Structures are given as structure tokens and as C-alpha cells.
Regions:
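A short glycine-rich, Lys/Arg-flanked "PGG" loop and its adjoining helix->strand segment in the class I
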Residues: 13-28
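Conserved class I S-adenosyl-L-methionine
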Residues: 28-71
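Short conserved AdoMet
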Residues: 10, 24, 104, 108
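C-terminal lobe and adjacent flexible extensions of AdoMet/dcAdoMet transferase-like proteins
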Residues: 105-169
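Substrate-binding/catalytic lobe of Class I Rossmann-like enzymes that use SAM or dcSAM, i.e.
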Residues: 61-131
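Short, solvent-exposed loop/turn segments at secondary-structure junctions
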Residues: 6, 36-37, 115-120
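A short SAM/SAH-binding and catalytic strip from SAM-dependent methyltransferases
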Residues: 1-13
């Protein structure tokens, strides 16, 4: 079982070869993982979609809860700087976009389920606390974001960044 750990591995093939050898022939490998761009190096298209959807959120739900800008209305999505990601944690998302291909080389994928977060991971960073179940409007906005993301991923307009995968040797 890999739970948000494979994206930290520098030698995916070596790790997966060992796991494949360790599993019984009728065994299963379960993976819950970030499979998006290495070190969060988003494409211009991904950034454009995130920013466009972000601007659909009314200002009252874009109030930051982050310490450095608490109470201020966010005007744009704050994307991580890949160089800073590498500096802070050299293993963070080092080969994340290669996980699925590496799994396919060593396992038979039985199930692949996109789990959301392609747009929302950074789009809702520090503002997610503004969305409360007791606020029907905020729930409608969240549902709209879920629907846009799900539709774009299902149609191939965006690649999934998170997935649950079941594989066999």
C-alpha cells in the first residue's frame, strides 16, 4: 500500500520492482497518490483554468486564512515555485508524473479512479475555511468547482493530479 508516498520516491522502478516481487501472484497493490506534474510545474493551460475558475468564486469566499495575508481577499491562485519546492523538500513530487507509467511497467492496473484535487489543491489553499456546510451558497460554489474539474478531467481537458489505483503483479 502506498499512501501519498510514491511521489517522494526518486527511483520509482526500483521500488515497484521490489513491491511486485514481494506480492503474491494473487495479491493487490493499493495506491493513493499525487500523480500530477513533477514539483507542481503546472502547464500554462492548467494555470489558466485554475485562475479562471478561481475568479468564479465570490470575493467573500476568497478571504485568506494564511498568516501572511489573513483577512485579505485573494486576487489570484498562489502556485508553488518548483525551485522553492525542490529547495524545501528535494523529494517532493520528484517524479510524480511518471508514477502511472512506472506502475504500468511492473503491474497490471485493475482500477484507476481519479479522486479530485486537480484544480482545488492550490486554488482553495488558505481559503477553504470560508466554505461551510451551514452556508448553502458556499456549498453551491464548491459543487460548481467540483463539477467543472470533474468535467474537464473526464473530457481530457485536464489530466488528473490525484488517483486511487489498484494493481496486480
Amino acid at each position: 500500500y502506498f499512501n501519498s508516498s510514491l511521489h517522494h520516491m526518486s527511483d520509482l522502478d526500483a521500488i515497484l520492482i521490489k513491491r511486485c516481487a514481494a506480492l503474491k501472484q494473487d495479491g493487490y497493490l493499493f495506491v493513493n497518490e499525487y500523480i500530477g506534474p513533477n514539483r507542481f510545474t503546472f502547464s500554462d493551460r492548467e494555470k489558466e483554468v485554475m485562475q479562471s475558475v478561481f475568479h468564479l468564486i465570490p470575493e467573500k469566499y476568497r478571504v485568506s486564512h494564511a498568516e501572511h495575508d489573513r483577512g485579505q481577499i485573494r486576487k489570484q491562485v498562489h502556485y508553488p515555485d518548483p525551485a522553492e519546492v525542490e529547495r524545501v523538500d528535494p523529494s517532493e513530487a520528484i517524479h510524480s508524473e511518471e508514477i502511472v507509467d512506472s506502475l504500468k511497467r511492473h503491474f497490471k492496473i485493475e482500477e484507476f479512479n481519479y479522486t479530485g484535487g486537480t484544480l482545488m489543491q492550490f486554488m482553495l489553499l488558505d481559503i477553504a475555511g470560508n466554505f461551510k456546510e451551514s452556508d448553502a451558497e458556499s456549498m453551491q460554489i464548491l459543487q460548481l468547482i467540483f463539477d467543472i474539474e470533474d468535467t474537464l478531467v473526464a473530457s481530457g481537458g485536464l489530466l488528473p493530479h490525484f488517483a486511487m489505483i489498484i494493481a496486480r503483479p
